[in-house]
Amino acid sequence: MSFASAPTVPTNTSHYADLPAASSALFQAKARRGLTFDQIAKAIGKDEVWLAAAFYGQARFTEDELITVGEVLGIGSSELVSQLGSHWWPNRGLGPMPPTDPVIYRLYESVLVYGHAIKAVIHEKFGDGIMSMIDCKINVERKEDPKGDRVLLTFDGKFLPYARW
């Protein structure tokens, strides 16, 4: 496994201050086991981006998923369930605005630069409405390119027309 792809624990944890302690335990166990989000996600039948969002407290595990994740990571699932079980709800929207992390800032910048253009094209193709982030799948792929590998992001969101009344 190359250094660039080795699972790690993020070094700056200030933006995790409002997350349950279980989130930190999940990241540490993932790094200790040397597993990727994709490997863990497959164990519970989820996508790697969804699983990463759940680690960051932005998506909600079921109790069965918490038990399986605990088994895969070798950590006590009873502690995970007690912190992230059916009584817990995500507080979505993590981090400062504007973002300070370079990767997250570039995603933010892409919406600042291309947001209105994307919106206009969505309206031309679908009509007056929005793309759901609730009913959405996100995929991250690596695309080889002679000028340097590229990041291919796919947002597969359900179109929701605005209601008329």
UniProtKB/Swiss-Prot annotation:
GO terms for biological process: cyanate metabolic process. Its EC number is 4.2.1.104. SMART domains: Cyanate_lyase. Disulfide bonds: none annotated. Keywords: Lyase. It is an enzyme of class 4 (lyase). Catalyzes the reaction of cyanate with bicarbonate to produce ammonia and carbon dioxide. PANTHER family: CYANATE HYDRATASE. Belongs to the cyanase family. This is Cyanate hydratase.
